[in-house]
Amino acid sequence: MATYLAPPVSSNKENSPAPNIALSDIDAISLSLRTSLSGVTLPAKKKVAALGLGRAPKFTYRRHSNKPYNRSTSITRAKKAAVQTKSVRSKAAVKKSNTRPLPLKLVQRLDVESARLERLRKAVWNPPAPVPGQVRVPLKLPYPRFPSIEYIDNEYLKEIPVQYIFDRMVPLLPSIATITLAYQPYASIPHPDSKILRDTTLAFAIPEVIDGRKPHWAAKARGREPDLALAVAYKSGEGSNGNTVVAVNSLAFATQCAYWPRLLTTSIPIPTPKRPTPSASAVSTSLPAIVETEENVSDASFSSSSSWSDSDSEVEFIDLPRLPRPVKDDKGFLHLPLVELPIPSPSTFPIIHRHLHHPSRALLPDLLGLPEHYTTRSQVLDAISGLSVQQLMDKLTTLQGVWQNLCSLGIGRLGTWRQLGEAWACVVGVIAGQGLLIAGQEEAEVQRTGRKTAAEDVAWEWVRREKAKEQQ
């Protein structure tokens, strides 16, 4: 191996002696490169007067640059970021285009099936008592004709037209109802006249007046006191859980009920049937059969619902003593004659009582148990559309009870029957609409001759509403 002497090195220390070192070939080459590079003097770095990108680094060899890293300017970083963003977007687009469309979710099918099962569940009706056969519900209620009220059975009012009396009473009826309902019965207070039978009268009084808390109420109630005590009960043969006794002003009933004089007449017909009639042996169910007839129903057809029938009975008249007059004793108790009022549906008598004392108030909300402002068909449908058939049948039973009471009392005001018919059409229409929706029938498929009933219009309106909800 050859041995070289180290060449002279130019440095700042020129006066220092160069040592004699024996070098190998590799060491000599490495030392030569280092000494050659060390002799290169870089020019002075100029100061930048203003902001800028600066000067790019100067390279001679990757390992021997004047800076230990590659300079990355702001423009370079911006370009690099733009390229990366573009590549990410292109990859996402390719990935999105290559993805397959998602299959139909089974959850949607389950939702449709659960909705169908829920509709079937709501369409079930469980009557409180077994009903033999099928229950036929008419699309409209029959409207029987009632006799006109010719006079008021009162010695001071016989010569005055009934309509005139009623028109003068209409503004006073709400206050009469408030006062009469404030009277409470006191069964332990005897009648001041010992000759009066005990069970023929009943003592009433306003508790706040009797105990002295509000004695001024007695002056306000003067002229509007009740004159009759009604024991509201089921008709004979239908059972009863107890009668409801309420004090009333008989004039409010006498001016609006065609059959009211039957309760106060001195001669009461007692039927003696020749043979049992089919109506007498029929068993009453939760929803008795109602035969749908034309509107011009005769009085004879209605007489079958009363407690006697002139065609099949021998009527015997017996004279009964006239009802005792109302008397107020010295303690402030009002002794009223007690009269039993047998009606088909005592549970719906409060609706009748309120309607007779508030004739200008809408009856439709009371019939369906809705707030007072629900007076149109659209509002009623909004309220009852979500009810089940079980709940709708309960409302239908209430409506039928009101219908029976109207027929029994002889209330024939046209406005009353129109509102009852509208309530009946709304409830029956929703029940029929549920059947149409379950069966999948379309309105165009139904062939019909003649005019639609109100219940049919409600049924198809309900179906259209439900289909619109399903599409949302």
Swiss-Prot record:
The keyword Glycoprotein applies. Glycans are attached at N70, N296. Disruption phenotype: Expression is not seen in haploid cells where both copies of the gene are deleted and there is no discernible phenotype with respect to haplotype growth in strains with complete deletions. However, there is a complete absence of sexual development and strains fail to form dikaryotic filaments/spores. Where only a single copy is present in a wild-type and mutant mating pair sexual development is indistinguishable from a wild-type mating pair. Expression is up-regulated during sexual development. Required for developmental progression after cells of opposite mating types fuse with one another, essential for processes common to both dikaryotic filament formation and monokaryotic fruiting. A direct target for transcription factors Sxi1-alpha and Sxi2-a. GO terms for biological process: sporocarp development involved in asexual reproduction; sporocarp development involved in sexual reproduction. The keyword Glycoprotein applies. Keywords: Glycoprotein. This is Clampless protein 1. It comes from the Eukaryota. It comes from Cryptococcus neoformans var. neoformans serotype D (strain JEC21 / ATCC MYA-565).
